[in-house]
Amino acid sequence: MRRRRPLTVRGAGALVAAVCCVIAANVFGTRILLYIGLLLAALTLFSLLAVRLPRRSGTVTRQISTDLLTVSETSRVTVRISLRALRVPHGLWHDILPAAVAGDSGGEYPPESGQLTYPITGVRRGVWPLGPLMLRTVDPFGLAQREQAFGETRSITVVPEVFALAPLAVRVGAAGGTAHTSSTRLGQGSDNLSPRGYIPGDSMRRIHWRATAHRGQLMVRQEEEEESSPDAVVVLDRSAGRWDAPGADADPAFETAVSLCASAAVHLASEGYSVDVIDSAGTLLGALRGHEDDRDGLLVALAMVAPRGEGRDLAALIGGTPPGPLVFITGRLDEEDAARLRPAGAAAPMLFSTELLPGAAEAATPHGWTVATLGPVIADAWEDAVSARIGVGDVPR
């Protein structure tokens, strides 16, 4: 954060003019120039003291209209500042925003409404700090300025965008059977359950994300959640070799893959499937079992994922009963790796790659994969895969 100079351009000019007047008065013996120089210097010093001496302190609270900010979504931030000072200063305020969030977070102080509000738009997923609040004041002559930070920062979570996807051509369940829906699972809403504080050892599946966001500490659901095998599995391949090396800017291909991961999981859950979302190392990123809070938990986890490490064998990742729909999302895929990729008995395996190298699609198809190239438009890639599945035996419902 760049610190402002104590003098404005006008103030610096006045100080330079004062020095020049004093020098000229000595050279030419002109007393009036000496008076002018001393007056400018005194005025600059007075302005500097008037701005810098008053003691100010205060607290800042921020309220965001949405618990989670989605990429491309616009939300509103309300800032309340309790300022303690001898007199209310007049100036300009601005809230410091990270590059991952866009918005016009500034205006005149004090505001007419008594509170500060501004819109923000999610640009890049992740957990980012908002603040601190900066207040800039200038003396009446415009010679000196002061910029002071108030309050602490607040974290905001930007989650991947979820797109509407076309329905599957046919409903399939575990091991190719009919997909089943548990009415007890889908009938419950996590918001109807009383959350409690997190205790070491609690399952991450039971974290109540909305209550956590509201209270600022980890909260979990109190009910005993039954463990069950998923009807569908979504795998996000985070292997470092599949993606570009991390840099200052986000990898567009990986961001698209994360967004498809979220979209596919939410879509399958909306069709009645219980869904597990895992990465290529076997880490559980989310489990959608019909609770209203499951979606938020998945999106929060996906907000923080990045390419890393190496992947494991897909059959070892899934284990147990093969799922019905299996969605595998990867980056750069060559023919050799595609030939080793087996769907582990899944009834409806779909493979999405952001960069299919020559021969990769042909090597994966004989194993039962429906292969689609994942481009910028996620819905189109999904529709291509769903349409292709009709050609390999699925019957439209």
Please report, for each region that a protein language model flagged, where it lies by residue.
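Extracellular/lumenal glycan-associated context and N-glycosylation machinery
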Residues: 1-61
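Exposed, interaction-prone extracellular/peripheral surfaces
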Residues: 2, 200-397
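Short, structured coil/loop segments at alpha-helix boundaries
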Residues: 9, 30, 98-99, 291-292, ...
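An amphipathic, basic-hydrophobic helix/alpha-beta surface used to engage anionic
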Residues: 42-286
